[in-house]
């Protein structure tokens, strides 16, 4: 059976004509039902004939991720633990904000892999190891779940406004499925997200970086987190295989649209990378590119190897960057009371499962 959410529009058109003998326009109808109207069954597609719906049901399925757990923070952040068809667990987070007019807007943080191979020492997902890549249908299934949860059914006035590939996994290590997802997101008859409302975040992987830039399908964010190669090797051991200086050199010629800048994500770890000496090194790096900085205050979970920086060090770090004409914004951590940082909810769920299994095990 073909999972129809894994098909690009061109693939769906070929499937409808070759497998079902339908005219090409039928693919457009099905496509709009899948992505604009969030249909979970072929029976919902009321402008498609019953005979065609029956043939679709014989040869294809529509597989959404199943919602395993939902947690809502006091600040409105909502985190989902989703179960995929093979039982794998991934996370997605909805982060609320308000427009200047006070209208609710939601940013969704998307996962693209089950687990992660990068092994970043500050990240809960990194401690889980890598299981597999997610398919396009699984990646975009997170968006469908979010829209259904929000009752977001008006493409002309969407509640879900922005998407960030900053969840579980490294996007450039699942480049093919991420690029397929971006094309479907950009499709005006599909999910219809402007590239300016999508950001792909990478640890700094050489392979695929240029292809992403030349596609023009999304903005780029780089999870920098280290002002020099020594710290990069310590806290981001896999990413450090591509030397920090080489990464910045590649970003100097990264294709950018008018008024577009690379966003550097910098996680402030207490006593590790949050000193003025680190800020000086960071200025030298970022000033080589057309970029801006998002400063993220570390949100430690129980048993984590790092501490949050002090408010004094955070302020001094930010002020130094501004004094050197580097745009730096402190990004407030949301959802701290529901383990909203990447991988924390899944890690908690796995620990609970292990504890339950141990409690139920027969005694020797």
From Swiss-Prot:
Gene Ontology terms, MF aspect: 4 iron, 4 sulfur cluster binding; metal ion binding; rRNA (adenine(2503)-C2-)-methyltransferase activity; rRNA binding; tRNA (adenine(37)-C2)-methyltransferase activity; tRNA binding
Coiled-coil region(s): none
Annotated SUPFAM superfamilies: Radical SAM enzymes
CDD domains in the cross-refs: Radical_SAM
First-level EC class: transferase
GO biological process: one example: rRNA base methylation
Active site per UniProt: 91, 342
Domain of life: Bacteria
Named cofactor requirement(s): [4Fe-4S] cluster
Annotated binding of [4Fe-4S] cluster, by residue: 116, 120, 123
A GO cellular component annotation in the UniProt record: cytoplasm
Catalytic reaction(s) noted: adenosine(2503) in 23S rRNA + 2 reduced [2Fe-2S]-[ferredoxin] + 2 S-adenosyl-L-methionine = 2-methyladenosine(2503) in 23S rRNA + 5'-deoxyadenosine + L-methionine + 2 oxidized [2Fe-2S]-[ferredoxin] + S-adenosyl-L-homocysteine; adenosine(37) in tRNA + 2 reduced [2Fe-2S]-[ferredoxin] + 2 S-adenosyl-L-methionine = 2-methyladenosine(37) in tRNA + 5'-deoxyadenosine + L-methionine + 2 oxidized [2Fe-2S]-[ferredoxin] + S-adenosyl-L-homocysteine
Comment on bound cofactor: Binds 1 [4Fe-4S] cluster. The cluster is coordinated with 3 cysteines and an exchangeable S-adenosyl-L-methionine.
EC nos: 2.1.1.192
Disulfide bonds: 109-342
Pfam families assigned: Radical_SAM, RlmN_N
Compartments (UniProt record): Cytoplasm
Radical SAM core domain location: 102-337
Additional information: Reaction proceeds by a ping-pong mechanism involving intermediate methylation of a conserved cysteine residue.
Physiological role: Specifically methylates position 2 of adenine 2503 in 23S rRNA and position 2 of adenine 37 in tRNAs. m2A2503 modification seems to play a crucial role in the proofreading step occurring at the peptidyl transferase center and thus would serve to optimize ribosomal fidelity.
Family membership: Belongs to the radical SAM superfamily. RlmN family.
Protein name: Dual-specificity RNA methyltransferase RlmN
Species of origin: Nitratidesulfovibrio vulgaris (strain DP4)
């Amino acid at each position: 059976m073909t999972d129809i959410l894994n098909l690009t529009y061109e693939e769906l058109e070929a499937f409808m004509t070759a497998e079902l003998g339908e005219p090409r326009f039928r693919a457009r109808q099905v496509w709009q039902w899948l992505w604009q109207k969030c249909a979970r069954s072929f029976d919902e597609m009321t402008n498609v004939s019953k005979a065609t719906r029956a043939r679709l049901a014989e040869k294809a399925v529509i597989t959404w991720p199943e919602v395993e757990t939902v947690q809502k923070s006091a600040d409105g952040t909502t985190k989902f633990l989703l179960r995929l068809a093979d039982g794998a667990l991934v996370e997605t987070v909805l982060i609320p904000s308000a427009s200047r007019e006070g209208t609710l807007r939601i940013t969704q943080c998307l996962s693209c892999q089950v687990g992660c191979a990068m092994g970043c020492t500050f990240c809960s997902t990194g401690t889980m190891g890598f299981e597999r890549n997610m398919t396009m249908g699984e990646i975009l299934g997170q968006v469908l779940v979010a829209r259904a949860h929000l009752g977001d059914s008006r493409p002309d006035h969407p509640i879900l406004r922005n998407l960030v590939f900053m969840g579980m996994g490294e996007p450039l290590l699942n480049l093919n499925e991420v690029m397929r997802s971006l094309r479907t997101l950009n499709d005006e008859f599909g999910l219809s997200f402007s590239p300016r409302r999508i950001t792909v975040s990478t640890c700094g992987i050489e392979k695929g970086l240029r292809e992403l830039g030349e596609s023009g399908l999304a903005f780029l964010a780089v999870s920098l987190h280290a002002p020099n190669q020594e710290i990069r090797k310590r806290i981001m051991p896999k990413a450090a295989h591509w030397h920090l200086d080489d990464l910045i050199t590649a970003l100097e010629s990264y294709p950018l649209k008018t008024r577009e800048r690379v966003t550097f994500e910098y996680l402030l770890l207490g006593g590790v990378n949050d000193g003025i000496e680190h800020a000086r090194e960071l200025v030298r790096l970022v000033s080589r590119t057309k970029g801006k900085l998002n400063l993220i205050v570390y949100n430690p979970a129980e048993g984590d190897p790092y501490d949050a920086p002090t408010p004094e060090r955070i302020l001094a770090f930010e002020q130094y960057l501004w004094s050197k004409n580097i745009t730096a914004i402190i990004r407030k951590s949301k959802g701290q009371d529901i383990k909203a940082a990447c991988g924390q909810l899944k890690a908690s769920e796995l620990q609970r499962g292990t504890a339950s299994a141990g409690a139920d095990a027969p005694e020797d």
